[in-house]
Amino acid sequence: MTSPVNKLITREPVLISELATVKEAACLMSEEDISCLLVADAQDSVSMIGIMTDRDLRTRVIAQGLDYTTLVRHIMTPAPITIDSSHFVFEAMLTMLTHNVHHLPVLHLGKPVGVIGISDIIRYESHNSLFVVSSIFDAQSVEEISALIPDIHASFTRMVNEDANSHMIGSAMSVIGRSIKQRLLALAQEQLGEPPIPYCFLALGSMARDEQLVLTDQDNALILDDSYNAELHGEYFLKLARFVCDGLAECGYSYCTGNIMATNTRWRQPLSVWKGYFTEWIEQPTPESLLNSSIFFDLDGVWGQTEWADELTALIAKKAQASPHFLACLTRNAINRKPPLGFFKDFVVEKDGEHRNTINLKRRGTAPLSDLIRVYALAVGSTAQNSFERLDDIIAANILPPGRGPDLRDALEFISMVRIRHQALDLEADRVPDNNIEPEQISPFERRNLKDAFQIVANAQKFIVIKYPPNRRF
């Protein structure tokens, strides 16, 4: 997965002029024994302006009864999704999964040097999350999706054993989670009929941040068109929400104990209401508002009018950046969960209960880091969702002392990987994965570095209090 994508290229790309006919294109594809052509600008034979696939011929020409003299330019997909030859196989896989494309032109210095397809990645990377996602979209029922849970777990452990980093693993698992949501929504619409008004299904929390692992509950919501009428449309969207949330539960995503789900009427509202929610939470940061902010300000549209999610993200960034009082209040929440280090820098473990002598790496490690990074990201107006991408924006804005940004990145990566490896070991031992590690069960190297990582978190919490004093009125 960490090999460069150019390793997948088996031949030079075949280009055809945008002014060629679809018959000429079909003949060329047959002669070359290929499933797609790159479409060249009529004025520049090496500049790609589109792509045409065998699927396009079937669905846009034959099925529509178009004449075979139709020009390629009229049935091609313009400005196709591409990838640079220096990127990794993993990134190519994610790009294809995210955009649901089967052919991906590869560029070098802006010019096409090849095209890779799903079969190329399958040949190069057998038994990975691409198979899982493909199987999810082929599933005809919730039961068929839930039957893929062992494959999802196997994909996770494979990535861990191949030394993928936490960003790669989190992104891949989040793509799988989104795919399950998307397939459930498609199945729901098959059962309920087309929606009466447009809507957007939101993923929240770790999935929105591309940081999902194998142990997670579901946090989701619905944005409805502003034409929403509860009497006319309410029953449809309640049934849709129940279908999806029940399906997610059956597929291993447990119900949210805080009821942050689309089945909750409060979180199934028109776009204008959502804008009102977010504006109120920022302008009137009560304890409940701050709790909601920490959940809903990591959001991603996975189905429907996904541009509404982008609209809300932009609103959050603009209003939060302009509100020092809100940032100060959010800081108070961000420092509530302390890293598990004692006065003498020894580990502070749970004293009793079923998790006695353990540390919860999510609650005491990655979650406090995500909270800190979110505050800084909002302060610089970042619209990024992923914690590593937020750190890129934070570092670029120069609001941290030299070295602090990279330190936070290293701490997040190390704590995340200890947590990830622990869950992979649980799965391989047929145990239910959790976030609780026993310090004595990890290597001395990991213990030393885990203490260093927790100290970075503790120092960052002290610094953010100075930068955004929670008790100061603005």
Q: Can you say where each PLM-predicted feature lies in the sequence?
A:
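The conserved cystathionine-beta-synthase
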Residues: 15-33, 40-41, 82-100, 107
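A cytosolic small-molecule/anion-sensing beta-strand core signal
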Residues: 41, 53, 76, 108, ...
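Tandem CBS (Bateman) regulatory domains
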Residues: 1-11, 48-99, 112-159
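Conserved helix-loop functional segments at active or binding sites
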Residues: 31, 63, 67, 186-190
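A nucleotide- and high-energy phosphate-metabolite-utilizing enzyme signature
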Residues: 133-474
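Short beta-strand-to-loop transition segments that serve as allosteric relay/switch motifs
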Residues: 42, 119-121, 224-228
